[in-house]
Amino acid sequence: KKLLAQAGFPNGMTTDLWAMPVQRPYNPNAKRIAELMQADLAKIGVKAEIKSFEWGEYRKRMQAGEHQMGMLGWTGDNGDPDNFLNTLLGCDSAKTNGSNVAKFCYQPFEEVVQKAKVVSNPTERTKLYEKAQVIFKEQAPWFTIAHAVQLKPVRKEVIDFKLSPFGRHTFYGVDMK
C-alpha cells in the first residue's frame, strides 16, 4: 500500500488481469490462479478485473501489448538459458509478435544477455546468465509463479526410461525386463 501511495495511487487502483483460456503443464487452471492473484491484489488496494479471450486472440493481444497484467508461460525446449532469458526478456523480443509480452527492454540486462549468447567459456557464460537473472528479479517486469512437474506413468517391466527435461520421449537404451 505504501508503494502504491508513493507511485501516486493513495486510494489504490484498478487494472485488468488476463487469464489464459487454456490449460498448460505450468498452469493447469489459469482462471483459478487469476482469482487467487485477484484476491491478493485486493489486499493491497488493487482492484483487478479478470478477462480472457479465445486462445489465438489472447496471444495476439498479449503480443501486441494490449494487456495491463496477463499470464503466459514457457517450456524451454533446448536447455540453453538464452532460450528463456533472451527469448522472453530481450529487447528484440519486445517488438510486436515477439515473446517478450511485458515489452521489457532494459539495456543493462540486454548487454549482459547479448554478451552471454556469444561467450564460449562455460564458467564465464554461467556468471553472465546468473547476473542476468539478478537483474531480471530486481527489475521485475514479471514474476514467476510455477514450474511444471513432469510425470509419466511407466510399467514396472520398462527399464532405463528417463524423462527428458525438454518434454521429449527418447527410447534409446530403453528395454523390457
State where each predicted segment sits.
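Structural transition elements
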Residues: K1-Q6, R24-R32
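Short, well-ordered beta-strand elements
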Residues: G12-R24, E49, Q68-M69
